[in-house]
Amino acid sequence: MYAVIKTGGKQYKVAVGEKLKVEQIPADIDAEITLDQVLAVGEGESIKFGTPLVSGASVKATVVSQGRHAKVTIFKMRRRKHYQKHGGHRQNYTELRIDAINA
């Protein structure tokens, strides 16, 4: 069984037992959270799509860790003008383990 969930403005296809990194969710490590924005649920050949959400469906997950992705380096430059600008960004994430899909 799998589900398509929406969290942090992005969509993810998840199945029970998977781990995935999503945009940061303010929760403690080992806390159980419920993701109720389920866009689709499928099992085998049958797929149930929501309009836009599947009513009564939810996904239970456990927070495994909180962290930061690798740095993305930004470099801006104007040719012949001696202008150079360096920057960087590290995005926060939450790693989840999917425990159950309720449809």
From Swiss-Prot:
<keyword id="KW-0699">rRNA-binding</keyword>
<keyword id="KW-0687">Ribonucleoprotein</keyword>
<dbReference type="GO" id="GO:0003735">
    <property type="term" value="F:structural constituent of ribosome"/>
</dbReference>
<dbReference type="GO" id="GO:0005737">
    <property type="term" value="C:cytoplasm"/>
</dbReference>
<keyword id="KW-0694">RNA-binding</keyword>
<comment type="subunit">
    <text>Part of the 50S ribosomal subunit. Contacts protein L20.</text>
</comment>
<keyword id="KW-0689">Ribosomal protein</keyword>
<dbReference type="GO" id="GO:0005840">
    <property type="term" value="C:ribosome"/>
</dbReference>
<dbReference type="Pfam" id="PF00829">
    <property type="entry name" value="Ribosomal_L21p"/>
</dbReference>
<dbReference type="GO" id="GO:0019843">
    <property type="term" value="F:rRNA binding"/>
</dbReference>
<dbReference type="InterPro" id="IPR036164">
    <property type="entry name" value="bL21-like_sf"/>
</dbReference>
<comment type="similarity">
    <text>Belongs to the bacterial ribosomal protein bL21 family.</text>
</comment>
<dbReference type="GO" id="GO:1990904">
    <property type="term" value="C:ribonucleoprotein complex"/>
</dbReference>
<dbReference type="InterPro" id="IPR001787">
    <property type="entry name" value="Ribosomal_bL21"/>
</dbReference>
<dbReference type="InterPro" id="IPR018258">
    <property type="entry name" value="Ribosomal_bL21_CS"/>
</dbReference>
<comment type="function">
    <text>This protein binds to 23S rRNA in the presence of protein L20.</text>
</comment>
<dbReference type="GO" id="GO:0006412">
    <property type="term" value="P:translation"/>
</dbReference>
<protein>
    <recommendedName>
        <fullName>Large ribosomal subunit protein bL21</fullName>
    </recommendedName>
</protein>
<dbReference type="InterPro" id="IPR028909">
    <property type="entry name" value="bL21-like"/>
</dbReference>
